[in-house]
């Protein structure tokens, strides 16, 4: 379960319409959410609040063996009026990362009709145009306690409909008896997203590290006006193939990093085609699969690492994922499998009379009350994606992960009254003090979140 502040940051990205999926950093997000989830450490309590639509705070306290905590503040120039902040109302799927359905990339110019460069009557750029108002800023700071304290800061600003600037700062307090200056580093990231491709330029003061990330989407260019004018059925795609890479270089330490990857994923149209009426003028394309799935392939040439993942959404409440890694230099391999199962809490059908009546079933049988509406048909159930559907809401989720060494992680996350609870256990081989090996507990933890 992500932190409350991270949830607010994601809401800020959604409100400013920044596509975080169109990035090389998010190439394997689906597999990572299903396979690399972490269990809580010890007992942690989070108290959060979105006191105003523009200001949020979080207080965290950890105990059992070691007492630590943190204080977080967040400010946004964009009022998050529609963001749910109460722990009883926040959709659980927005807090628990899982299978992520990728949508077709959109051109930023299609957000509004004016777009960048719109001029007013005096020939100057109009400050009230919609794209000007989207130059929003987010400020975030978190202080980790106890000493040595660590301060993390984030400055995020939309420079244009296609560009975003992010500056992250990390500073650690020096030891009490040390006269050295506190360790600090700054990471600057400039992101550019056109829908067809995305590019990220990075610079870190830590060893003067320079980096570049890029992602290219094969298929029609969403910036092409002719594609937008075609009928929706003809231009609708059922899959998306993306290729990208990243490169790092530090002139001080002579460190070089390089990786490349591919991602093939089905789009929502792949499962909707079966239930959409066909048109004689524009026949419906054949779906690749009735189940949404995502395939990724990543390669790190310098270290010889090769990794493939396959994630499948078998139903709106069940997802599977697997990963196989291999190193061509050391011949070492890795195999991980995981799944998640959601429990849906169905809302009761509304009473026609407007009041709860224990004898409504008898009155309805006698014809005194109109019959209840029919439940959804199987075809409509197939159209439901994760978290979609008006008659169901997520109540809890169970995640399971196991690798070839029998390291097992089991995580349960759900809603208990007004609290959001996350509890997990870890099992695996452990080393004994006598030099032998045994199989036992590797971690147990519970995390509780309450927000207003």
From Swiss-Prot:
UniProt entry keywords in alphabetical sequence: Membrane, Mitochondrion, Mitochondrion outer membrane, Transmembrane, Transmembrane beta strand
Q: Which family does it belong to?
A: Belongs to the MDM10 family.
Oligomeric state and interaction partners are given as: Component of the ER-mitochondria encounter structure (ERMES) or MDM complex, composed of MMM1, MDM10, MDM12 and MDM34. Associates with the mitochondrial outer membrane sorting assembly machinery SAM(core) complex.
Q: Region entry Disordered: which residue ranges?
A: 105-130
**What biological processes does GO assign it?**
establishment of mitochondrion localization; mitochondrial genome maintenance; mitochondrial outer membrane translocase complex assembly; mitochondrion-endoplasmic reticulum membrane tethering; phospholipid transport; protein insertion into mitochondrial outer membrane
Protein name stated in the entry: Mitochondrial distribution and morphology protein 10
Q: Give the Pfam families listed for this entry.
A: MDM10 (PF12519)
| Record remark on domains | Lacks alpha-helical transmembrane segments, suggesting that it resides in the membrane via beta-sheet conformations similar to those predicted for other outer membrane proteins and porin.
Q: Which organism is it from?
A: Uncinocarpus reesii (strain UAMH 1704)
What does the protein in this record do? Component of the ERMES/MDM complex, which serves as a molecular tether to connect the endoplasmic reticulum and mitochondria. Components of this complex are involved in the control of mitochondrial shape and protein biogenesis and may function in phospholipid exchange. MDM10 is involved in the late assembly steps of the general translocase of the mitochondrial outer membrane (TOM complex). Functions in the TOM40-specific route of the assembly of outer membrane beta-barrel proteins, including the association of TOM40 with the receptor TOM22 and small TOM proteins.
Topology in the lipid bilayer is annotated as: Multi-pass membrane protein
- Give its localization: Mitochondrion outer membrane
**What S-S linkages are listed for this chain?**
none
- Identify the GO cellular component terms for this protein: ERMES complex; SAM complex
Instruction: Give the gene that encodes this protein.
Output: MDM10
